Design a protein with these regions (language model features):
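Conserved NTP phosphate-binding and transfer environment spanning the P-loop NTPase/kinase superfamily
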Residues: 65-204
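Conserved nucleotide-sensing/catalytic segment adjacent to the nucleotide-binding pocket
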Residues: 12-83
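Short, small-residue-biased leader/transition segments that mark boundaries at the very start
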Residues: 1-6
Length: 204
């Protein structure tokens, strides 16, 4: 990041690497923060979720699926293999809360005081489904996973406790970010405001 301050966020960013779009995994490392790895070099995204014109700038590198229909998707490359397998220490771990409206007493970002509270929110998996899958409206599912039945929860619960305890013990900030993506009228401005708050937190 440059040393000078500016209202233009781009002045702070020289490069950005996407380690994983929506599928990755964590490993514990003794004596340090958990590490994050990616599992894929591309992203499978909704056309409507991208900035206007961005997808078409990448048209020669992307695969478009039904671009004329609702929930049109595209596959596009976002990272190299060497980037996703490197393993990056985690500094910040946030649950994406897209359904709560940001108000005077409810900010875009807040942090959990302990692992128990963080686990409760993640296990509940509340989110405002926008019809991108078979779900619609405010729904809940184990770790917000809308695909298929949850399996082997008893085995997974042991891992969840272990990993969240390690996040807190190693000083990782664990919380939630309210994107307002599922709040009517805030679909565009909400995520932008949340992103700015996140950026302000990062550069502190």
């Amino acid at each position: 990041f440059p040393t000078r301050r500016s209202s233009d966020l781009e002045d702070y960013i020289s490069d950005m690497t996407i380690v994983f779009d929506d599928m990755g995994y964590l490993t514990l490392k003794e004596g340090s923060k958990p590490l994050a790895f990616g599992t894929e070099i591309g992203a499978f995204v909704r056309l409507d979720d991208l900035d206007t014109g961005y997808a078409f700038k990448e048209i020669d590198r992307s695969i478009f699926m039904n671009p004329d229909k609702i929930n049109a998707r595209l596959v596009m490359p976002v990272a190299s293999y060497k980037d996703i397998i490197k393993g990056y220490p985690i500094d910040l771990f946030l649950y994406a809360n897209n359904y709560e409206e940001v108000k005077d007493d409810i900010g875009e970002i807040d942090f959990f005081k302990n692992a128990k509270d963080a686990i409760a929110v993640c296990k509940k998996g509340a989110r405002m489904a926008k019809g991108t899958t078979t779900e619609l409206g405010l729904v809940t599912s184990y770790f917000a996973n809308p695909f298929g039945p949850v399996q082997k929860q008893e085995l997974v619960n042991v891992l969840i406790d272990k990993y969240f305890d390690d996040l807190f013990k190693t000083g990782v900030k664990v919380g939630q970010i309210r994107t307002s993506l599922g709040v009517k009228g805030q679909e565009k401005d909400g995520p932008k405001k949340a992103a700015k708050k996140l950026f302000e937190l990062i550069i502190k």
